[in-house]
């Protein structure tokens, strides 16, 4: 399936990338049923269930093209059948049941079975198996298979177990094939049950997919889909403007406004589940509550949205977007530079004697991410905070976050497309989560009981209370809910996906 090895691909990426970006070649390919996407991140791994890449929301567009989730999700975030045709709990929520489709085929032509479902869950549940949220999957065990129905005992109750089956690491892999080739063999030649099969891959350059002829969801609209890895936003703009790519995303908003009405192009820019935030890592100067709160009150979020993002975006003060189940509009952390100055003065800091620390950010991963951090650093400087900017790739962010080595402040885009507070505030702020930066016992005491709360109203209120406490303590700095800018050729029809995932098989088609 792969003409060259990944190592060879990395070595040769420069030359082949040049040929991939040639406009004439891709213009001709598009006419023949190929969709070319200038994508904003690279693909570090083909395993959608293990390692840091598995919890990167931006990669889900690719993973959901090659693999299938247990449970599907519509553009409005509601759930629908996928590999599971039905699912549920028993009355006292001590058992779960799942019915498996009988018309699903892997890319190698073999049939998907309930054993694949069980094996995938058990693999995810292994504490040393590399799944970043293994404890979620370890919540059910003692599986039994009767024809197409699977039953299991609930070992540790998790109210969002089935939501996770449509979320990060919730993918089913082929048991027989994976055990035959092993993890390295799977990386070299991955297969799934999704609408597209991997046809060719060149590290840091592109991924080419071809339609799965036996896909249970019907024939995909494009014979071939090419994800071109273009982390630089300026280059993505050039890709769509020159016609080298048919579609791109996460371009600067001024470029979106300029190009959306250009002949031959269209655009869509609507809110997604992506939240821009600054992680705050405990330790050093961040252990000072006055410093943390000053950081929060010194940032004029609305000004950033208006001036840098051309009005695209919504101010947030918690890690819950307006579409999330635990969103509470009464929790506010207002822009108040006078209060920020007063708080810093109480800890002995001023413009002449500023508190100093490093802030990390990506550059081009999200529209104006670096420029936004520059603006924030300027606002901080006005009240007595001197922050040094360090730029990194998003993959480095995951590496540092999972080892609790982020800088005192670090920009990130948090995606939570199931809208539950456990997958926003929970995983971002609970110290036992590998995705949290702030670790403290006082916050854990408020969050820990909520994981197993069976009363839904009490559970949601508990998360709202935790969000309020976090805001009062300044444990994280939420910035904004993003609107996702997508530009595409006018002969395409693109359906906005609130999750932010671009899905060539279902939400992109020929007009």
Which sequence ranges carry the predicted segments?
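Gly/Pro-rich hinge or "lid" segments in bacterial periplasmic/extracellular proteins
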Residues: 64, 74-78, 167-220, 224, ...
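Surface-exposed binding/hinge segments that line
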Residues: 88, 99, 133-177
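Ligand-site clamp/hinge motif
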Residues: 212-258, 386
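Append "and occasionally in soluble cytosolic enzymes with long acidic Gly/Pro-rich linkers
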Residues: 208-213, 261, 287-378, 382, ...
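N-terminal lobe/hinge region of extracytoplasmic solute-binding protein
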Residues: 38-91, 122, 189-193
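A structural "hinge/loop" feature
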Residues: 41-60, 83-84, 110, 161-170, ...
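Aromatic- and charge-enriched surface segment that lines or borders ligand/interaction sites
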Residues: 86-130, 151-153, 239, 285-286
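Detector for C-terminal structural segments
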Residues: 15, 26, 202, 268, ...
């Amino acid at each position: 399936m792969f003409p060259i090895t990944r190592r060879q691909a990395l070595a040769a990426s420069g030359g082949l990338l040049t040929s991939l970006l040639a406009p004439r070649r891709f213009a001709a390919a598009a006419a023949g049923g190929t969709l070319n996407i200038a994508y904003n991140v690279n693909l570090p791994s083909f395993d959608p269930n293990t390692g840091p890449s598995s919890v990167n929301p931006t990669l889900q567009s690719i993973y959901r093209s090659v693999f299938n989730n247990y449970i599907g999700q519509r553009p409005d975030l509601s759930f629908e059948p996928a590999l599971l045709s039905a699912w549920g709990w028993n009355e006292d929520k001590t058992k779960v049941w799942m019915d498996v489709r009988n018309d699903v085929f892997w890319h190698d032509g073999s049939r998907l079975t309930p054993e694949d479902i069980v094996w995938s869950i058990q693999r995810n549940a292994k504490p040393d198996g590399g799944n970043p949220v293994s404890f979620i999957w370890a919540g059910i065990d003692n599986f039994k298979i009767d024809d197409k129905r699977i039953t299991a005992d609930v070992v540790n109750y998790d109210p969002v177990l089935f939501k996770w089956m449509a979320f990060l690491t919730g993918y089913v892999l082929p048991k027989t094939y994976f055990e035959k080739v092993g993890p390295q063999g799977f990386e070299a030649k991955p297969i799934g049950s999704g609408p597209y099969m991997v046809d060719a891959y060149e590290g840091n350059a592109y991924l080419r997919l071809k339609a799965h002829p036996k896909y249970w969801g019907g024939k995909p609209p494009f014979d071939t889909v090419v994800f071109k890895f273009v982390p630089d936003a300026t280059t993505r703009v050039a890709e769509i403007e020159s016609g080298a790519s048919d579609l791109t995303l996460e371009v600067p908003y001024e470029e979106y406004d300029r190009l959306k009405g250009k002949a031959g192009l269209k655009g869509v820019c609507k809110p997604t589940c992506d939240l821009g935030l600054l992680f705050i890592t405990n330790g050093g100067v961040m252990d000072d509550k006055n410093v943390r709160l000053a950081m929060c009150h010194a940032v004029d979020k609305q000004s950033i949205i208006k001036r840098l993002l051309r009005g695209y975006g919504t101010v947030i003060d918690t890690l819950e977007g307006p579409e999330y189940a635990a969103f509470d509009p009464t929790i506010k952390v207002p822009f108040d530079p006078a209060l920020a100055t007063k708080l810093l003065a109480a800890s002995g800091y001023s413009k002449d004697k500023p508190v100093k620390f490093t802030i990390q950010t990506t550059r081009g991963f999200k529209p104006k991410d670096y420029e936004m951090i520059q603006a924030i650093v300027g606002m901080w400087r006005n009240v007595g905070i001197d922050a040094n900017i360090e730029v990194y790739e998003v993959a480095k962010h995951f590496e540092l976050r999972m080892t609790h080595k982020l800088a005192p402040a670090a920009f990130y885009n948090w995606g939570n497309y199931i809208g539950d507070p456990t997958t926003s505030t929970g995983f971002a702020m609970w110290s036992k989560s590998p995705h949290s930066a702030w670790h403290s016992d006082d916050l854990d005491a408020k969050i820990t009981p909520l994981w197993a709360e069976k009363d839904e109203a009490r559970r949601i209120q508990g998360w709202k209370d935790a969000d309020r406490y976090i805001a009062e303590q300044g444990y994280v700095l939420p910035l904004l809910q993003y609107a996702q800018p997508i530009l595409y050729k006018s002969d395409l029809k693109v359906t906005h996906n609130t999750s932010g995932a671009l899905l060539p098989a279902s939400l992109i088609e020929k007009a």
